[in-house]
Amino acid sequence: MAQEITGHYVTIDNTRIYYDECGKGIPFFCIHTAGASSLIYRYFLPIMADNGFRVIAPDLPGHGKSYPVNWEPFRNMHQYAEFVWKIAKAVCGGEKPVVNGCAIGGDMALDLACYHSEECRAVIAMQGALQTKTFPDVSEDEQTHACPGWQDIFERAASMAIYYPCPPERVRELRWHHRFNGQYIMAGDGQTWVSQDCRGKLKNIKCPIMLFKGEADYYVPEKLIDETLAGIKEGLGEKFIGKKVGHYPIYEEPGYAAKVVMDFLKRKKVI
């Protein structure tokens, strides 16, 4: 029987932040994808909880049930990641977490590894790389009048980046995950994605880190994964190419993604 997911709130820098929690044990902190919410992890959380983790997945600022910081979206990856780290510190009870991020969350996870690796047990960066200038400039599209078709465009941008064939109901659910966050916030996420720049910082990573790329994902070419891995000290980093998954492994095939993560953590003697 799957463990129950419960909802909680925490206040960070006068900003009310929502997070899902499931299970007990070592903190396993999950950072969601651009324009979505913690819902993207709804199938993954109970599986990791059954593996002995206290799994935590916040709604990023301005997403889902979380308020934005100072009523503005983030537009810079490092600033975004530093705020998310404050969330992790507040909810992990003083314990070192395993940090797992996907897509924009994967970029954040990599940024956190560069700046806070000594405070992490391990990091899993799914669809994250040292640079991700792989999305158009959306800085002029924050307001609805600037791009009236934004919602459908963004939903398609998400649903086309998964592995096919995929059950139609899973595609519909993924589109819904990207339907209820405002254009203002989603455009901020797009700007944040292209601002990612960990060049020169990868040498600072001191904890085990896995770079996970879904084979069907076209937002992060394998070349970027290889360039990222090359900058990490030998023995700490691993690359994994996920079969029959795309941009959202933790949603598309949560059981498979969990097994890959568990195998990595055991191999690196994190657990």
Predicted features and spans:
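Alpha/beta-hydrolase fold catalytic core
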Residues: M1-F29, D50-F53, G93-G94, F180, ...
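Conserved HGGG/HGGXW glycine-rich cap/lid loop of the alpha/beta-hydrolase fold
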Residues: T15-Y67
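Conserved catalytic-core motifs of eukaryotic protein kinase domains, centered on the activation segment
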Residues: I40-R42, S66-E72, F135-P136, E222-K223
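Active-site loop/oxyanion-hole signature of alpha/beta-hydrolase fold enzymes
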Residues: D50, A57-N100, G255, K259
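Gly/Ala-rich beta-loop-alpha elbow adjacent to hydrolase catalytic centers
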Residues: G101, G105, A109
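Flexible "cap/lid" loop of the alpha/beta hydrolase fold
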Residues: L110-Y115, C120-W150
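Conserved alpha/beta-hydrolase catalytic His-Asp/Glu region
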Residues: T134-F135, W150-K206
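Conserved loop-alpha-helix segment in the C-terminal half of the alpha/beta-hydrolase fold
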Residues: K206-V245, Y251, Y256
